[in-house]
Amino acid sequence: MPRRRVIGQRKILPDPKFKSELLAKFVNILMVDGKKSTAEKIVYTALDSMAEKSGKDHLAIFEEALENVRPAVEVKSRRVGGSTYQVPVEVRPVRRNALAMRWLVEAARKRGEKSMAQRLAAEMLDASENKGTAVKKREDVHRMADANKAFAHYRW
């Protein structure tokens, strides 16, 4: 392993419409096969339809949905003396956002609506109201961490 300096993370340019770095990251996570303009179109259409349905600001709904999906703790496998323990660890802020966005996109892809924009809008509206598949995923992760609280002293 080279002993040179650690290279910092690349800066993501904010999205052109709302000037939000978080939204730009979300577009990148949604993007398939490098088709960024398609991903942007899907996200903006979803945000517009969400704002229309709820009457709130585009970014406010998006932020609220993300906040309700962000995990506080997760479990990591740790091998101790021949057996593997699921050790609960706190999630770093950058990873919190990444996981929340990934879970939102996964949940939206599994929904039954016609277009991806409709699925994404429905999932984000559900998440902003603290329901839906993405929120359930977060609850499952928290439940798993809570169940393995006894192994918290194995943290590294």
Swiss-Prot record:
Entry's Gene Ontology BP terms: translation
KW Ribosomal protein (keyword) present: yes
GO cellular component: small ribosomal subunit
Record keywords, A-Z: Ribonucleoprotein, Ribosomal protein, RNA-binding, rRNA-binding, tRNA-binding
Record CDD domains: uS7_Bacteria (cd14869)
GO molecular function, one term: rRNA binding
InterPro entries in the record: Ribosomal_uS7 (IPR000235), Ribosomal_uS7_bac/org-type (IPR005717), Ribosomal_uS7_CS (IPR020606), Ribosomal_uS7_dom (IPR023798), Ribosomal_uS7_dom_sf (IPR036823)
Keyword RNA-binding appears in the UniProt entry: yes
Pfam family of the protein (one): Ribosomal_S7
The protein's assembly and partners: Part of the 30S ribosomal subunit. Contacts proteins S9 and S11.
Family of the protein in this entry: Belongs to the universal ribosomal protein uS7 family.
HAMAP family listed in its UniProt record: Ribosomal_uS7_B (MF_00480_B)
Protein's job: One of the primary rRNA binding proteins, it binds directly to 16S rRNA where it nucleates assembly of the head domain of the 30S subunit. Is located at the subunit interface close to the decoding center, probably blocks exit of the E-site tRNA.
Protein name in UniProt: Small ribosomal subunit protein uS7
Organism: Vibrio campbellii (strain ATCC BAA-1116)
